[in-house]
Amino acid sequence: MTSPTDQREVGSHVAAIYDAMQAEYDRIEDEFYFASCYQVYRECVAAIASARPDGLALDLGCGTGKQTILLARRAGRVIGIDISERMIESARKRCEASPNVSFVCGDITRLPFEDGCVEAMLAYGDVIGHNFTAVDVVLKEMVRVCKPRGLISFEVDSKWCPDLLYLPGELWSALTTRGGHLREWKGMQFKTFTWRELRDLLRTHGLRLLDVRSMNVLTMLIPPSLLFRRREEAPRFDVFFQKVMKLDLALGRFLRCGSTRIVTVEKP
């Protein structure tokens, strides 16, 4: 399959796939891998919302609104943005009892907000990674709409991930690509980042690093054929996985390795 490389084509491709996934997307948390991710998301959302409880908060790439509704419980006003219209439909239903939440279907390379109006924003999942042709544009937009001393918390995929051992084609791509390489999930490409590359991005956009949380440090040693199964399908393994996940959650606070990193920064 030939993947799109023009940013507009990439956006349309990603939107179409997420539209098609909408009905089953909420079940993704039932998979072993994502169960660990969502635990970290909940902790990070609570920390960001508590640090900036007033003003406008954005959830970029909000999907079906799982993080949006958590923000809404603590933030003054929340706007969720997603490129998929069907995901936005689900998010509206989830948050219909929250009067301080609204949604916009749009592209995060062109945020429809004035300069310096946002107190805090999230971009979890492959929101930045899917925009692999426009990473600098996305960061520039996020910085533009953020208030001075506003918080930005976003997730990026790590280049060197243990699961590459199970995927020789992707391992070869990583070895032969300078900096982050492209990987694929559900027919969509996403960019990975080296630590140096990420650090340089923050410096380029004038952002001050506050915190880094690594996710799935140990769990990526589990073969993908098991890691991406639903927990109900492997109840015996789930007991073992719970122990690994607890250890992962602890290690992720100190180690800068794992499948992805959640980076929290402040605009000076």
Name each region found by the language model.
Residues 136-151:
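A short glycine-rich, Lys/Arg-flanked "PGG" loop and its adjoining helix->strand segment in the class I
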